[in-house]
Amino acid sequence: MFLREVVLQNFRGYKNQHRIPIDQLTAFIGKNDAGKSSIFDALAVFFDHPLGKIDASDICVHAGASGELRIGCVFSDFPNSITIDASSITTLAEEFLLNVDGLLEIHKVYEFSDGVLKKQKIFAIANHPTAEGFDGLLSKKNAELKKSWRGCEYRYRSR
């Protein structure tokens, strides 16, 4: 896989969402305190490097009292297929895990309030299909799914 883009929001000097393109050869040039090292520190946090620790001092000072700190990475050239278990081989596209550009985009999000960071949440920014009445299927428990199906069962059997 190749890293194509780094996404930063409310991380140190990056208040609004910034998308930093990465190519095969990328150089960061700028004045002192312009945020060059922050990009590398954000990558260390994203990839769980032992030196990449995040704390409340990493929240952008202009972010306000509450919000979310976001570190994301966009990847290309990922494997053609992935093996879930011995009998299940699929692709990221078949699992609807790719963004609108056909790339794998993963974000780590830390909500904060009054200078306190909460536990991270990890999201795939994906172009997932939608249909009326089927919102939030991935977050529903089995009983809720059965209830949803009973409500629409007749519509689909009568076609």
What positions do the PLM features span?
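Beta-strand secondary-structure signal
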Residues: 5-7, 19, 70-74, 105-107
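Pre-Walker A-like glycine/lysine-rich segment at the N-terminus of P-loop NTPase domains
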Residues: 1-48, 57-66
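Short acidic, gly/pro-rich beta-turn/loop elements at beta-sheet edges
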Residues: 16, 30, 81-83, 118
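Electropositive, glycine-dotted interaction segments
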Residues: 70, 88-159
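Conserved P-loop NTP-binding catalytic core
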Residues: 40-102
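Beta-strand elements of well-folded, non-transmembrane domains
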Residues: 26, 75-79, 110-114
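Generic intrinsically disordered, low-complexity segments enriched for polar/acidic and small residues
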Residues: 8-11, 25, 37, 43-44, ...
